[in-house]
Amino acid sequence: YFISRRLYQFFVYPEIDAITEEKIIEPMATKFRDSNFDLIETLKLLLKSEHFFDSSNFNSMIKSPLEYVYGALKFFNLHQEDFYMNLLNYKDGNSYELPEKFTNPLSREFYFYQKFIWDLEQQGCNFGDPPSVSGWPPYYQAPVYDLFWINSKTLSSRAGFANNFQWDLFIYNDWENDSDVKYRVNYAKIIEGFDNPSDIYSVVNQFVNNLLTVELGQEQLNDLTEIILGSIDPTYYTELYNRYTENPTFENKNELNERFRNFTTHLLTLSENHVF
């Protein structure tokens, strides 16, 4: 029963009432015992149940730092070609080669994920080093549970992570060459995979549907669209996208990408993005 409850609390909801105990936990415990303690079979029973897909369970828990950070990184589908050297004190228009550690596949992965491990730590989840053998309190400590993930410090750190998308994601500081390595999100490539990518309203809806599980109101969607458009007419965005697809130069791609930087930061900081 203990393991079945823990699985339920992790995948569905931290609080278990008497009805859930009888209808869900007991069958899970029976399956776990009868399957010779096979966790996969027990999880299948839970994840395929009608209860798991009950809409009352949607958006009922706060995302952990792992879900918040890596959920965004997965959607934006980071690519190595978008690493670049950023000179701290000057820009002369030249391109600079990345340090070897960022071109070697093994070391590249280390330095890339090292930055995001630091982000997790700032948000209250020191990945690989839980505070006790019980793990992190949000997964077991009644009655607060997942609310532990949010406080003034961790919320500020989440906002800092989201703000990286506005100014490019800092990856590594190269003190010797007075420069740093950053990652630039290739929004143009993401949008190309959308349905009807030349329509700004369709694009905004697809960003929202991919990143949020909460349905936004029309006023919120209008505000997000306005962040992208600024003072320009929606038809100009269509022209901008078509110009990029017809002639995908760096300048055309960059002009399209710039429209989505501030938008992404706002989208990731919405309160609706902190629940699932």
Regions flagged by a language model, labelled:
Residues 38-39:
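Helix N-cap / loop-to-helix initiation motif
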